[in-house]
Amino acid sequence: MLEIDVHKKLRDFDLEAKLSISDGEILMLVGDNGCGKTTLLNLIAGLASPDSGRISLDGRAIFDSTMKIDVTPEARNIGYVFQNYALFPHMSVYDNVAFGLRTRGLPNKEIDILVKDQLEAAGLWEIRKAKASYISGGQKQRAALARAIIIEPSILLLDEPLSALDVRKQAAMRRDLREMIHVCKVPSIIVTHDLRDVACIGDRACFMENGRITLSRTADDMMNWDLKADASENEIKKIESYAKI
């Protein structure tokens, strides 16, 4: 289980987030641009440090301001799919996916087996030699996810993984994305602003405003209006403001 209780002062507001995500659970983090969603992912990944608080995985602290613990990003074993995918444009699809394994010093033969299995599962084996700069948006998304998954991460973080795709490709990718993530059976957080992602991918959804979690429901509850009888008027308006279906 991933447990987060952190505070960080930002330019326009203070980020204060308290969350827990179970193994195998996909949490959808929903909110407007600039509300702190990506910052929270970066705090979990170790790319930025909270001012105070604690982040732990299965009871082991990876950040604790009181105990002066701040595990390096590399040692946190996190698979991170950035919004722009962050593939190396001059490298082939194969080399991009193999990159994390090579930094761990695995033998080439083992890397070959693992990368082939991952590329075949992602439907990318046929374009393994293509440079990342020449493949489609959907292929980049699959390659970025394959690179994140192949290292057998303890946590998966995905920042707007479908935003660069057109609407038709987004619809086709949602089911595949959920299946690929669930194979890992680790706590996963996906940042999105689209309730279609919540409906098709997530197990639970949290809404963030100005650095704070203002609403948390299961994905089914979020999408099933009949179950919102106990929701406040403001909560319903918040959900409706993101509904695009």
Placement of each model-derived feature along the sequence:
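Short coil-to-helix segment of the ABC ATPase nucleotide-binding domain corresponding to the Q-loop/switch region
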Residues: 91-99
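Conserved ABC ATPase signature
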Residues: 131-135, 139
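A short, proline-enriched helix->beta-strand linker immediately N-terminal to the Walker B motif
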Residues: 150-154
